From Swiss-Prot:
CDD domains: UBA_EF-Ts. It comes from Clostridium botulinum (strain Loch Maree / Type A3). This is Elongation factor Ts. Its main location: cytoplasm. InterPro entries: EF-Ts_dimer_sf, Transl_elong_EFTs/EF1B, Transl_elong_EFTs/EF1B_dimer, Transl_elong_Ts_CS, UBA-like_sf. Residues 80-83 are annotated as: Involved in Mg(2+) ion dislocation from EF-Tu.
């Protein structure tokens, strides 16, 4: 006979529904471990069905080592904002960012094949699949990035509960406690303004030529004479640099300073040059096309699947 305690134990072990647990235990003559396997098999089958659904919600998670010399950032997606704040989902996202920081891999695909940092008996991809079965939504480790520095600091900033995450690499020959605060200021700038490039050197030729052509056509359409068009184009390109290159942007906390000027002032105080060497900015779901479905159609679809 299947007792309430047996059902409770199986629910705690698997997170499956009460009736599913009871059916599995009945099927396995009360053998708890076999029932776990049965539910996993059913859960994995359900997870496979869910894998085709769009996962555009989720969170961005970062991890910084205690010495602030290494950092990582990951985007972990799910289908709804409800699951994105689920304790188990957030815990897994945070563990994935920590694992990425200490791993030798450089892509999400490679990380999925590693042993899971919190339970080395499982691969990362299997842990994700288990959570898909448990929470009933498709999930996807979309991307990861890492930064490290010998002299300087790595700092992160998370905005909006994981909607935006930023990783910043600040280089400085002198170790100073204030570097962390400066790096956070820069990370907040990146979160707020979403710069496309670190500096002018990072702007590729194709992008630059495309912008020049757009500005050239705009100037000609405004009826400007040919001789002044090039001057106008260069003026607008300089404006483009100031808007899209991090070090040339006006600092959001004090519009009298550019980021370069702010770092120069801080360099004087510390007594050593401070430079931003790299940054990574992730915004959850950016670039993912989310299918909008009619609620009534969605309910009908689920009813049809249940037949």
């Amino acid at each position: 006979m299947i007792s309430a305690k047996m059902v409770k134990d199986l629910r705690e072990k698997t997170g499956a529904g009460m009736m599913d647990c009871k059916k599995a235990l009945t099927e396995c003559d009360g053998d708890l471990e076999k029932a776990v396997e049965v539910l996993r098999e059913k859960g994995l089958a359900a997870a496979a069905k869910k894998s085709g659904r769009v996962a555009a919600e989720g969170i961005v998670s970062t991890y910084i080592s205690e010495d602030m010399k290494n950092g990582s950032i990951v985007e972990f997606n799910c289908e709804t904002d409800f699951v994105s704040v689920n304790e188990l989902f957030v815990e897994l996202a945070n563990n994935l960012s920590k694992q990425a920081a200490f791993s030798n891999v450089s892509t999400a695909e490679e990380l999925l094949e590693e042993k899971y940092i919190a339970d080395e008996s499982k691969l990362v991809k299997d842990v994700i699949t288990e959570l898909i079965a448990k929470l009933g939504e498709n999930m996807n480790l979309r991307r990861i990035a890492k930064l490290s520095v010998d002299k300087g600091v790595i700092k992160s900033y998370i905005h909006g509960g994981g909607r935006i995450g930023v990783l910043v690499k600040l280089a400085c020959e002198k170790e100073d406690a204030k570097l962390a605060e400066i790096a956070k200021d820069v990370a907040m700038q990146v979160a707020a303004t979403n710069p496309l490039f670190l500096n002018r050197d990072g702007v590729d030729t194709d992008t630059l030529e495309k912008e020049k052509e757009i500005y050239r056509v705009q100037a000609l359409n405004e009826g400007k004479p040919e001789k002044v068009v090039e001057k106008m184009v260069m003026g607008r390109i300089n404006k483009y640099y100031k808007e899209n290159c991090l070090v040339e942007q006006l600092w959001v906390k004090n519009g009298d300073y550019t980021i370069t000027k702010y770092l120069q002032e801080q360099s004087k105080e510390i007594g050593a040059d401070i430079t931003v060497e790299a940054f990574v900015r992730y915004e959850k779901g950016e670039g993912i096309e989310k299918k909008e479905e009619d609620f009534a159609e969605e309910v009908q679809r689920q009813m049809n699947q249940g037949k």
